[in-house]
Amino acid sequence: MTVLTVVLGTPFLFGDHPVRWEAGSKLPTLVLDDAPESTAPADTTDVKASPSPTADPLKVAEPWKKGMPQWGVQLYWEEEKTKRSDAFIEKQAEKHAKYLIGLGANSVSVSFPFYIESRTSNVLSEGAKTPSPARVERVLKVFKDAGFRTTLRPIMDEGSLKQANGWRGNIEPDSRSAWFASYKKLVTPYLKVADEAKTNTFVIGTELNSLEGDVGWGPLVSSAEKSFSGEVSYDANWDNYVRGRISMPVNHLGVDAYFPVKVADTASVGTLAKGWNDWLDRKATGKLPNILIAESGIGAMKGAYHAPGDFYARRTVNEKVQANWYTAVCQVVQERQMQGVYWWSIHFDDDPNTAPDDKTASRLDFAGRPLTEKAIKTCFSSDYAGPGTDDSTS
């Protein structure tokens, strides 16, 4: 087991989606509808995510190998009130696999919720929306059989954290030892099925800022490695990447990256990339081969650059904003020789081939938005070879 110390930056999630923090703020703030309106003409090119020319539409054309970039998507899975059959979830996973192959993805991360009663609670549990270990295994096997690099990632749901500043990153259990014991009991069955499904990575924690560096992680990770033979990782929040150290006893550290860039909707891809690099440079300049963008995205709406992960706002749709952001992030990943990027997100029960209903859907949804799909396909089909396999940078 290797102990890595890295500073990582990302957004946190309210419920099952990311919500942004303004730099230096203790509370999440919504971006007001005050950004200059884009005057750029709308690009109406109809670009669908079509399968790559492979012999089998359910097979990744070039499966991931160590040293290659991870080009992926975060698939968020909440069980519906009316539980779907095992046959349904396998068919649904196949539908997503086919769509992701059409985008050129070689990786997928399956995220799912678990629950806490309050900010100070020591008890963690499954809920009605938590898929069972057996059902998770079925879905992971569909993606593995299709040739994807697979990740399993439990995320603490924040629905019970009603305080004004309540989020997973500032929980304070009354007894940390009891909290870790409860968490071990919760995740162990998922570690075992992840191992059975030959999953590449298990994310042992996501955005748990207040618990990072706690002595409880050592025994938990040691236990996890007895049940799971793949990589054990941790995904940290974006602001930590630039302002603090994270010491976690894991194989790898990822970052959920939603760096705010204070520019107009008409900003060029180069300007957006510079905004990202300015944030990254606060930690380190040059190549970042140890860093994986475990989660990134932005709303397809005006003013989104100011708060990329704002799930709740539904300002005027501007797909160009989202597409240009994706292009800029991909450019930075390649220029800094990072490990790859996973886009947030697609909901498991959604049809990725259907455009989102902008009256109700999150602006962060990208599936079914032609310009963004085109940007993803261009990113995933680039000639970027990846960070390489040097042990010092893998």
Features from the language model and the residues they span:
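Conserved, mostly hydrophobic/aromatic
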Residues: 100, 108, 202, 253, ...
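Short, acidic/polar
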Residues: 84-100, 180-193, 237-246, 323-331
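Substrate-binding cleft and catalytic face of glycoside hydrolase catalytic domains
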Residues: 103-122, 134-211, 346-349
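Active-site neighborhood of glycoside hydrolase catalytic domains
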Residues: 186, 201, 211-235
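Aromatic-rich peripheral "rim/lid" segments of glycoside hydrolase catalytic domains that contact
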Residues: 6, 11, 15-41, 46-67, ...
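Glycoside hydrolase catalytic-domain groove-lining segments
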Residues: 132-133, 138, 146-149, 153, ...
